Amino acid sequence: KPKFSKMEPITNEPNIVSGMIKKSDGDSIPGLVLLIKNHKGEAVRALKTNALGQFSISTPLVDGIYTLEVGSTVEDTTFDIITIEVKGEVIPPIELIGKEA
């Protein structure tokens, strides 16, 4: 289940996925690859976090069920696969918080 941030969405456009990837201690993680996969498990977007650990897609996803998977590794940190439903609404920023391995 996704953890939504209290931050305002970066856009009012529906079906735009954005958020932040953090370590368990709250530190942001720059340069991580995030994959957004459709219900068939096919990657439909690949993103890289910026210097602040933030990510965002620039074009909206088609309505449906998607998973967010951290595609690169971080020393001693693992991430759950997050499932989201996209349904023509503004999506609040999502926080992916790592767990100590």
Predicted feature locations:
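A short, solvent-exposed loop/turn motif at the edges and junctions
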Residues: 42, 65-85
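Short, ordered, surface-exposed loop/turn motifs in non-cytosolic proteins
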Residues: 17, 24-39
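Short, acidic Ser/Thr/Gly-rich low-complexity loop/linker segments typical of extracellular
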Residues: 40-54
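Short strand-edge motifs at loop-to-beta-strand transitions and within beta-strands
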Residues: 53-57, 92
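Beta-strand-rich domain onsets/edges
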Residues: 1-16, 22-25
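Short beta-strand edge segments in extracellular beta-sheet folds
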Residues: 82-91, 97-99
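Short Pro-Gly-centered beta-turn/loop motif in secreted/extracellular proteins
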Residues: 56-67
